[in-house]
Amino acid sequence: DMGYGDLGCNNPDSKIPTPNLDRLAKQGMRFTDAHASSSVCTPSRYNVLTGRYCWRSHLKRGIVWEWDALLINSDQKTVAHLLREQGYHTACLGKWHLGWNWPMKNGKHPNDYVDFGVPERAKRSELGKQIDYDSRIEGGPIDRGFNTYFGVDVPNFRPILGSRMTN
């Protein structure tokens, strides 16, 4: 992770040399008054990728749970879509935590068994045992405009490469 004060252009006393980023800052436009749309991860990620407030989605508070459905609608463009349209190759690396269309062995989705909100840990654990980990996981970064993805949905999960869990 890199903080705001780690860049030489923002902090002349920074211990980390960032000559290329400093040059970009000098030659381009700098945004120095940013605000987070939320203090937690899911809504902030949603906002950065879509440019929309997360509270306009079906998530009205908190974060998505580990087997939750995709938060970004299939017809909604992300910054990755916009970059690809301009010829860029995009990658998403790290924690996604915006939901996926998790495949279950019985063909359903974990949310089919949950009325509202985050289920209790025992219920989540039970649902996790029914996930088909060998199938493609739809609705993640690859289906939302990114060319490449490597990361986890939530901490302590097996890594996902593209749209499949790794061993």
PLM ranges: what are they?
Residues 1-167:
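Formylglycine-dependent sulfatase
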